């Protein structure tokens, strides 16, 4: 199967996707009523899109093409308002977080959608287990070769993005001991982790053609790498973040990725090579397991450094780009988060340590999403 040409888009424009949990009070388990909610809100949208994800307990909010994080925030805030209003009318709750802490995957109903039903046929129970919730950020690129360079550049910072957004310590009623357990769900999929090595868009087209020979890949949407090019949109899409508990944190993460993309494409600080990825999964694991307390290992020198320290270095590097893009408030907020030493996974554990229950935790997450 041939790959579509890379659609030229304005560099550094962005789009944000948030996979939200649809909750059924008073037990605060996942609901199976996302279709009802989506049908209720679609006529009220003026910008962006609200749509299904894999199962009936998931709802995706997606912005249109945005020039900066302020425009993206306005679109997401408007969608948040209409979703919460409809959820209240249907006696449902909405919240963020990368996993629901006690749902059972066997109860999850795959959406009545041709693509998702085909995916269920290919992957079986793995699809129901993939009832987890992430944030994806698209960044515009001028051409396919820039997209491949940007993908490799951003891959250096996958651990940083994971650690800052980690919000999935609980799963199936247990503390997983991970800051981000969500990404472990995808480890059984054949397209888990980093994209196979290519050095330019022509090589990527060849890779896609070979992947299509498997008959499991019909489009880019069927590839679930940590970062992937999206030729139809003319973007690179970062897919490793847990859905945050607040809209503000989602905007901050998008601002960081946009600023990092600008820094990478204007400064070109790396010369990508295949060896860059030799320790990729080890460093990724450190971020998932320990969050900002993880330790990164340099593939070339063997030097080890705290992920928190390296994240502060990244934030300093991208600050000039953030100022040019109007994203400096996002960088300031994330810098403060790192210096305080926490993420949302840590907050969740503190809630439980203080005597809270998992049911109470989900209730609290719904309150946080409504601004209470």
Swiss-Prot record:
Matches recorded under Gene3D superfamilies: 3.30.590.20
Catalytic activity: L-cysteine + L-glutamate + ATP = gamma-L-glutamyl-L-cysteine + ADP + phosphate + H(+)
Entry coiled-coil feature ranges: none
Domain of life: Bacteria
Keywords: ATP-binding, Ligase, Nucleotide-binding
Enzyme class name: ligase
Molecular function per GO: ATP binding; glutamate-cysteine ligase activity
Metal-binding is among the record's keywords: no
Enzyme Commission number(s): 6.3.2.2
GO biological process, one term: modified amino acid biosynthetic process
Entry keyword Ligase: yes
Subunit structure: Homodimer.
Family according to the record: Belongs to the glutamate--cysteine ligase type 2 family. YbdK subfamily.
Job of this protein: ATP-dependent carboxylate-amine ligase which exhibits weak glutamate--cysteine ligase activity.
Protein name, UniProt field: Putative glutamate--cysteine ligase 2
């Amino acid at each position: 199967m041939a790959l579509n040409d890379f659609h030229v888009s304005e560099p550094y424009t962005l789009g944000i996707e948030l996979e939200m949990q649809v909750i059924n009070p008073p037990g605060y388990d996942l609901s199976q009523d996302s279709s009802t909610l989506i049908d209720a809100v679609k006529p009220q949208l003026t910008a962006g899109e609200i749509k299904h994800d894999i199962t009936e307990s998931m709802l995706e909010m997606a912005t249109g093409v945005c020039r900066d994080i302020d425009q993206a925030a306005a679109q997401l805030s408007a969608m948040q308002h209409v979703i919460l209003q409809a959820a209240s009318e249907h006696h449902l709750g909405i919240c963020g977080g990368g996993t629901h802490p006690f749902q059972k995957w066997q109860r999850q109903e795959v959406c009545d959608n041709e693509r998702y039903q085909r995916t269920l046929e290919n992957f079986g129970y793995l699809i129901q287990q993939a009832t987890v919730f992430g944030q994806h950020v698209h960044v515009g690129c001028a051409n396919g070769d820039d997209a491949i360079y940007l993908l490799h550049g951003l891959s250096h910072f996958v651990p940083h993005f994971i650690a800052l957004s980690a919000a999935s310590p609980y799963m199936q009623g247990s503390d997983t001991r991970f800051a981000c357990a969500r990404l472990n769900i995808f480890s059984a999929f054949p397209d888990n982790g980093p994209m196979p090595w290519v050095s330019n868009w022509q090589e990527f087209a060849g890779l896609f053609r070979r992947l299509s020979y498997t008959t499991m890949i019909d489009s880019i949407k069927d590839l679930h790498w940590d970062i992937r090019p999206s030729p139809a949109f003319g973007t690179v899409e970062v897919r490793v973040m847990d859905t945050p508990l607040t809209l503000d944190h989602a905007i901050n993460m998008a601002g960081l990725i946009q600023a990092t993309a600008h820094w990478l494409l204007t400064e070109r600080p790396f010369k990508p090579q295949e060896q860059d990825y030799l320790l990729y999964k080890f460093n990724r694991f450190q971020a998932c397991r320990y969050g900002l307390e993880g330790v990164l290992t340099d593939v070339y020198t063997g030097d080890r450094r705290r992920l928190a320290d390296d994240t502060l270095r990244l934030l300093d590097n991208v600050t000039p780009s953030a100022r040019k893009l109007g994203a400096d408030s996002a960088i300031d907020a994330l810098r403060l988060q790192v210096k305080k030493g926490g993420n949302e996974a840590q907050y969740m554990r503190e809630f439980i340590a203080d005597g809270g229950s998992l049911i109470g935790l989900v209730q609290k997450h719904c309150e946080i999403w409504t601004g209470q």
